[in-house]
């Protein structure tokens, strides 16, 4: 009943139900249909009465009353006159809320162009009329006339005429023989007279006939715009406005301030200018003013409307009274403070509070301590309701008083209300979903929120003054979700890697580590204990210490659940930890019977979670935390200055290195080495010294010492802290007790003089000064890093937000191949680690016995992975989000395991957002530096190869010859040495470069660490592969070759110099030729001549006439790259990969298999042609800058995908040449490498999800019978649908190839214009969408948040599914009725968000 009465007084309009939103151009009629009246005056309100002026910008007659149900003059008041229009003031009696909804309009005296369609590049008006923007502006702003109808004169259509030319033309041809116009009317008439269909037809035929690429591009661009207009039903002349809509007054309010001044929205100023100029123009036209004055006024009107829509887009910015630019309609939408990001995506919530956090070690994992005062305020509505229900108060007012007085019954009720009502805790910045979790509140005294220590890692919180916010979920559904999905006990695993995130840290680790230490010769060593009771007794009486070696009986259960006991060698401390382990057959005592470093504790928790489930894990974690704290306190581990031991050998090491540095200095002064080499050598020497000192220090701190009675001395406490993983790292210890070592300048260069002292000894003034560089740079970096990392996360979320698990299985037979990642012979990630939690694509068989290990379609868990590792499987095909064939989102089987739960992923999981968070969250830990590799600050690529395993050698693509010195030389460009174990399984693969000396052969046995090959790291050799005599060609002294004597050694070397710099040398082609016995040029095995072209700086190694054998070195080319190499690392590298940018010196990749031929060179580029083996293909040519080190010879055979020029490959090339799978593995490995360096583990599948989003588009190559144009970027899904329809109709389908888009570009090209507009470049996105009349189907998360609905993921996904089913049923019912009655039933109206300005 109450509700009905309320509804009568405050009628709620039913919310519009809609499934999609369309945006298009508004016609003048449409604008008039929205409007409630014309605004004729620029006045706003009367300064004395504060009432709105009639016909002004706030007019009550047009926009509605100011007070609810009361007209302006006060004649009609109250509800009973609802809907009456007052005859005196003309105001309708209704709710004042309509002032937020009713629009007005301004009739313009002259048409004006809409600036968005004029200036937003590419200009839509310009493209349609096929005129340049400059020309159109000349017409619009009244500089030139434009010929609209040339008649029979010599003028051309669309020709521009200046004032003079126009006059001359009128004199010459007479006024009626042609039509030329000026201003927006001219453009309007031209647009109105366009026959779009004819233009489209003409353009298509032009396209078919033209061959020039430039023209093609131009026609394509124009055709696209023309087709957009045709398809959307927009008319071109609507881009010129005759009526300007005025937004409702309450959206541009005028607020009185104290002191009789007003604060107003800038829009009012902008509208006032438009109205003033419009009225003045009307008056001038009525007065028949001279044309020049009218024109000037029209131009000013155009500028005023431009400023209203987009201030500052053209001409100077219009500023207000305080010299601040006025905020136009476009500015209202744009940027972080615009409507989209400020109000639609970021809303403030009520029922929240924030306070400082303190630690609450006695809490359970699912609890948090909430200050009473805070709880009382947050739960007020619930308390009022309970007070009412219990009869303590009858009105809200009474309840309020009771609460304010804080009566005892209020506290009792607060306890009741809070019971089992979870609250959400959030710590900013919320970088991933674990930044908001639900807890059950426990009321506490004081004013600080208590937080459970174990969840600190997830929140990245510490107790040095951090604050957290509390939010109260109000509705029952919200409470349910908080409890079931967000409770801290449900978030045990990290969504990024699947590793436990509820892991003890710091003090707790220290306590557990202390408990698990084993010491020699402790009291009670060798005792045997039957159970924990005995042990406790012995510990109390000090008969045994925590660290003594003892035997103890430990009880656990077997597979049937029966108790079994076994005696273990252990210590009392470890028995205490073991006692806490859940009793389970898969959690053996060994899990606790080891040194409790942070890593081992994490593994232990992981084991417990996998085998015992969530509840047991939570209880176990709580107990282990309490144990850790207790023993950290009892251990009394402290940090003293004397714990830092400086190694005695430091002085000697430092003096040795100083002597070395002096020697290098001397060598430099004698001219034996260059300054760069000296710098590198000195830096190298100091780096080695610093390493050695650190090693000595660690050895000394680690050393086990004994007292006189033979008992082991307590362990060094600093070592304990560092080794256990509680706090500190070896690098920090090195700075405290070793030597600080080398420092970098802000530019990234390393300062030659190191800091020899450590912090214990204290730094000298100079050393201190040098060390401040690095510290200052570190702070500056940190600030930049945070912003950059946040921006990366935002782009990632934006590109991946609509990737949701939508179906169970797409049934694809595509997938990725997973192999171990090997870095410098070390396996960094094994196959097992990579396939855990993924679905097998094919059956996985044992490589030796052929037994089936895992069936295809199995989600591989720890047990399967263990089998795969045991069997030594080296490559596994798995399903991946990248190759999933679901139309929208991904399917559960391709995605695999939900890492945060350890179970198959649920439908409706927003995997895109989780992927974005997992990659973005560790962003702040990555470095910002680009590493400058000065010379050999680190030794240039190693110069030898050692076997990383024992085994048998197998050589792939073997091409080895024995040279004159009897050494085996590698002649193959892609030769690889494999090391196999006994079972013949491949353990390691090493590429061996051309020109290396190799020491092993097929079938040899090698030991670990044995040399396999070596090469000169600083030069690349040119080898001969035939026997013969050497002859020189075009090697002319002083022009193309010169002898230089080394000053220090006096040895001369002959070096090729740049021969093109002299006029005589222009046509030379310096080369070394190997001749056969008859003195003719020898032939190579592949058929080319034995002529070896030399590049600049090549050093000759042979004399003319010398006899050579295969494998001998003819010349050496110094490697440029050894000098300096910038390595982009850290965050910039990740961003570069996700943005799919071409690296600066990118590699050139061969597109086809073929033979290399050298073409005619250009001035500073080399032309290289690949002649394909397959005669049906065309040869491909590449241009390579001459200075680049280039190692291929004429006649070399090259395979598709080989590098012609070394460097970082551009991802686009990999996609085009090697395909999607190669691209995926490249991106995944490169991105993982950056994170691995920082010790961050992220699962591959997250990167795959993002890459999937980057590959959503296809570039049309052949159009078939579709309406697409070659070069169009189309969604994969859309192309498939169109092709299906074409094939059904028996037509030719369109073809396309996948394109890789960077994440920013991909976000802007999403099918949803709302999502794109709220990301970046709002104006451009909306302009494009309006011209094309785009419809947003509201599929992603972002669009739904913006229009204020539940997101179609998680629990909201079910709702949207139900809504979809309901809609389809409605349509069925309507159809049925239609058929039954034979009458057309009106379609339910879709909400039409046709916007004019936006």
Swiss-Prot record:
UniProt-annotated binding residues for Zn(2+) 2: 810, 884, 891, 894
Residues at which Mg(2+) binds: 462, 464, 466
Gene3D superfamilies in the record: 1.10.132.30, 1.10.150.390, 1.10.1790.20, 1.10.40.90, 2.40.40.20, 2.40.50.100, RNA polymerase II, clamp domain (4.10.860.120), RNA polymerase Rpb1, domain 3 (1.10.274.100)
EC number: 2.7.7.6
GO terms classed as biological process: DNA-templated transcription
GO molecular function, one term: zinc ion binding
Enzyme class, spelled out: transferase
Superkingdom of source: Bacteria
Cofactors (names): Mg(2+); Zn(2+)
Cofactor, how bound (note): Binds 1 Mg(2+) ion per subunit. Binds 2 Zn(2+) ions per subunit.
Record's keyword terms, sorted: DNA-directed RNA polymerase, Magnesium, Metal-binding, Nucleotidyltransferase, Transcription, Transferase, Zinc
Record InterPro entries: DNA-dir_RpoC_beta_prime, DNA-dir_RpoC_beta_prime_bact, RNA_pol_asu, RNA_pol_N, RNA_pol_Rpb1_1, RNA_pol_Rpb1_3, RNA_pol_Rpb1_3_sf, RNA_pol_Rpb1_4
One Gene Ontology term, aspect cellular component: DNA-directed RNA polymerase complex
Residues that hold Zn(2+) 1 according to the record: 71, 73, 86, 89
Pfam families for the chain: RNA_pol_Rpb1_1, RNA_pol_Rpb1_2, RNA_pol_Rpb1_3, RNA_pol_Rpb1_4, RNA_pol_Rpb1_5
Summary of subunit composition and partner proteins: The RNAP catalytic core consists of 2 alpha, 1 beta, 1 beta' and 1 omega subunit. When a sigma factor is associated with the core the holoenzyme is formed, which can initiate transcription.
Role summary: DNA-dependent RNA polymerase catalyzes the transcription of DNA into RNA using the four ribonucleoside triphosphates as substrates.
Family, per entry: Belongs to the RNA polymerase beta' chain family.
Name of the protein: DNA-directed RNA polymerase subunit beta'
Source species: Mesorhizobium japonicum (strain LMG 29417 / CECT 9101 / MAFF 303099)
Gene designation: rpoC
């Amino acid at each position: 009943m109450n509700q009905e009465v309320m509804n009568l007084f405050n009628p709620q309009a039913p919310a519009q139900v809609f499934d999609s939103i369309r945006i298009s151009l508004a016609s003048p009629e449409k604008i008039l249909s929205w409007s409630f009246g014309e605004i004729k005056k620029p006045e706003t309100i009367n300064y004395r009465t504060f009432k709105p002026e009639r016909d002004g910008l706030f007019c009550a007659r047009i926009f509605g009353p100011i007070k609810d149900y009361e007209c302006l003059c006060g004649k009609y008041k109250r509800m009973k006159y609802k809907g009456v229009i007052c005859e005196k003031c003309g105001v309708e009696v209704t709710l004042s809320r309509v002032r937020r909804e009713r629009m007005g309009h301004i009739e313009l005296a002259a048409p004006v162009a809409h600036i968005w369609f004029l200036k937003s590049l590419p200009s839509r008006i310009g493209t349609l009329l096929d005129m340049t923007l400059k020309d159109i502006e000349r017409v619009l702003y009244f500089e030139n006339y434009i010929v609209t109808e040339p008649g029979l004169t010599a003028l051309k259509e669309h020709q521009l005429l200046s004032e003079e030319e126009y006059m001359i033309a009128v004199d010459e041809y007479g006024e009626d023989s042609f039509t030329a116009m000026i201003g927006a009317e001219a453009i309007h008439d031209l647009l109105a007279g366009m026959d779009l269909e004819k233009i489209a037809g003409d353009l298509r035929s032009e396209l078919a006939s033209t061959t020039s690429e430039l023209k093609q591009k131009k026609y394509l661009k124009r055709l696209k715009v023309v087709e957009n207009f045709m398809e959307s039903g927009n008319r071109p002349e609507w881009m010129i406005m005759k009526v300007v809509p005025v937004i409702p007054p309450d959206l541009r309010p005028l607020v009185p301030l104290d002191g009789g001044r007003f604060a107003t929205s800038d829009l009012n100023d902008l509208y006032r200018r438009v109205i003033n100029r419009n009225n003045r123009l009307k008056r001038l036209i009525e007065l028949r003013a001279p044309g020049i004055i009218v024109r000037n006024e029209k131009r000013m009107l155009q500028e005023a409307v431009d400023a209203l829509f987009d201030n500052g887009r053209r001409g100077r910015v219009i500023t207000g009274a305080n010299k601040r630019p006025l905020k136009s309609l476009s500015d209202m939408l744009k940027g972080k403070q615009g409507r989209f990001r400020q109000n639609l995506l970021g809303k403030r919530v009520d029922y929240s509070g924030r306070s400082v956090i303190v630690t609450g070690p006695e809490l359970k994992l699912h609890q948090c301590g909430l200050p009473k005062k805070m709880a009382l305020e947050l739960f007020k509505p619930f308390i009022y309701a309970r007070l009412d229900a219990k009869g303590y108060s009858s009105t809200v007012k009474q309840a309020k008083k009771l609460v304010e007085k804080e009566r005892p019954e209020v506290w009792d009720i607060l306890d009741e209300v809070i019971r089992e009502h979870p609250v959400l805790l959030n710590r900013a910045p919320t970088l991933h979903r674990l930044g908001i979790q639900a807890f059950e509140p426990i009321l506490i005294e004081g004013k600080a929120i208590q937080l459970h220590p174990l969840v600190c890692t997830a929140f990245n919180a510490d107790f040095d003054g951090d604050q957290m916010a509390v939010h109260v979920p109000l509705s029952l559904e919200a409470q349910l979700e908080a409890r079931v999905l967000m409770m801290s006990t449900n978030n045990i695993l990290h969504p990024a890697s699947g590793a436990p995130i509820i892991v003890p840290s710091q003090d707790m680790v220290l306590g557990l580590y202390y408990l698990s230490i084993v010491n020699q010769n402790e009291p009670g060593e060798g005792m045997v204990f039957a159970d924990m009771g005995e042990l406790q007794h012995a510990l109390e009486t000090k008969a045994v210490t925590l660290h003594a070696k003892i035997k103890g009986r430990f009880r656990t259960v077997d597979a049937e659940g029966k108790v079994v006991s076994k005696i273990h060698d252990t210590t009392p401390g470890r028995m205490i930890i073991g006692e806490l382990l859940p009793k389970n057959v898969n959690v053996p005592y060994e899990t606790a019977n080891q040194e409790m470093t942070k890593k081992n504790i994490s593994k232990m928790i992981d084991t417990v979670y996998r085998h015992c489930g969530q509840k047991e894990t939570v209880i176990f974690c709580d107990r282990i935390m309490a144990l850790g704290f207790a023993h950290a306190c009892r251990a009394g581990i402290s940090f003293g200055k004397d714990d830092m031991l400086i190694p005695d050998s430091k002085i000697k090491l430092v003096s040795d290195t100083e002597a070395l540095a002096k020697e290098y200095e001397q060598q430099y002064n004698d001219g034996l080495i260059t300054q760069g080499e000296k710098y590198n050598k000195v830096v190298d020497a100091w780096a080695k010294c610093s390493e050695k000192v650190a090693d000595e220090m660690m050895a000394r701190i680690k050393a086990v010492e004994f007292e006189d009675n033979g008992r082991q001395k307590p362990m060094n406490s600093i070592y304990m802290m560092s080794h256990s993983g509680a706090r500190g790292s070896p690098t920090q210890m090195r700075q405290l007790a070793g030597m600080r070592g080398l420092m970098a300048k802000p530019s990234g260069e390393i300062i030659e003089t190191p800091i020899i002292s450590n912090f214990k000894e204290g730094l000298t003034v100079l050393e201190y000064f040098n060390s401040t560089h690095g510290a200052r740079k570190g702070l500056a970096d940190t600030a930049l890093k945070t912003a950059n990392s946040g921006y990366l996360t935002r782009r990632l979320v934006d590109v991946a937000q609509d990737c949701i698990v939508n179906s169970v299985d797409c049934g694809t037979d595509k997938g990725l191949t997973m192999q171990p990642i090997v870095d410098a012979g070390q396996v960094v990630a094994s196959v097992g680690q990579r396939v855990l939690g993924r679905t097998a694509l094919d059956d996985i068989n044992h490589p030796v016995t052929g037994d089936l290990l895992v069936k295809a379609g199995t989600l591989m868990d720890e047990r399967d992975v263990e089998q795969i590792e045991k069997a030594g499987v080296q490559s596994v095909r798995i399903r991946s989000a990248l190759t999933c064939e679901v139309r929208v989102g991904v399917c559960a089987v391709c995605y695999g395991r939900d890492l945060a739960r350890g179970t198959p992923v649920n439908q409706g999981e927003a995997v895109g957002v989780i992927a974005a968070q997992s990659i973005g969250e560790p962003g702040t830990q990555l470095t910002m530096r680009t590493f400058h590799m000065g010379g050999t600050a680190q030794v240039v690529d190693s110069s030898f190869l050692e076997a990383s395993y024992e085994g048998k050698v197998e050589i792939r693509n073997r091409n080895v010859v024995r040279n004159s010195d009897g050494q085996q030389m590698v002649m193959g460009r892609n030769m690889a040495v494999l090391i196999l174990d006994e079972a013949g399984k491949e353990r390691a693969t090493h590429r061996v470069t051309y020109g290396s000396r190799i020491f092993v052969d097929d079938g040899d046995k090698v030991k670990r660490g044995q040399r396999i090959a070596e090469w000169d790291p600083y030069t690349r050799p040119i080898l001969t592969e035939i026997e013969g005599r050497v002859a020189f060609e075009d090697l002319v002294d002083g022009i193309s070759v010169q002898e230089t004597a080394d000053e220090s050694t006096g040895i001369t070397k002959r070096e090729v110099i740049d021969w093109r710099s002299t006029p005589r040398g222009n046509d030379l082609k310096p080369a070394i030729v190997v001749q056969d016995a008859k003195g003719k040029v020898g032939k190579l095995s592949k058929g080319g001549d034995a002529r070896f072209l030399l590049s600049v700086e090549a050093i000759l190694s042979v004399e003319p006439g010398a006899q050579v054998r295969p494998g001998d070195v003819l010349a050496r080319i110094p490697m440029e790259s050894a000098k300096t190499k910038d390595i982009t690392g850290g965050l910039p590298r990740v961003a570069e990969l996700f943005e799919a940018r071409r690296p600066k010196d990118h590699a050139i990749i061969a597109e086809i298999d073929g033979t290399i031929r050298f073409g005619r060179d250009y001035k500073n580029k080399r032309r290289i042609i690949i002649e394909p083996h397959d005669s049906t293909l065309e040869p491909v040519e590449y241009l390579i800058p001459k200075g680049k080190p280039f190692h291929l010879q004429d006649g070399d055979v090259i395979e598709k995908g080989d590098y012609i020029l070394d460097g970082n490959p551009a991802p686009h090339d990999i996609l085009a040449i090697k395909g999607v799978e190669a691209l995926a593995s490249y991106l995944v490995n490169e991105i993982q490498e950056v994170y691995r360096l920082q010790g961050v583990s992220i699962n591959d599948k997250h990167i795959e999800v993002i890459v999937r989003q980057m590959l959503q588009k296809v570039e049309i190559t052949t159009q078939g019978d579709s309406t697409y144009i070659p070069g169009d970027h189309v969604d994969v899904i859309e192309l498939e649908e169109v092709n299906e329809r074409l094939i059904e109709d028996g037509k030719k389908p369109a073809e396309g190839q996948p394109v890789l888009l960077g994440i920013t570009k991909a976000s802007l090209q999403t099918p949803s214009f709302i999502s794109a507009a709220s990301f970046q470049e709002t104006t451009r996105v909306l302009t494009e969408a309006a011209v094309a009349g785009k419809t947003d189907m509201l599929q992603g998360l972002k669009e739904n948040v913006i229009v204020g609905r539940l997101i179609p993921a998680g629990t909201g996904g079910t709702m949207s599914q139900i809504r979809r089913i309901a809609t389809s049923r409605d349509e069925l019912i309507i159809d049925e009725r239609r058929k039954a009655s034979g009458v057309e039933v009106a379609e339910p109206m879709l909400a039409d968000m046709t916007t004019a300005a936006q």
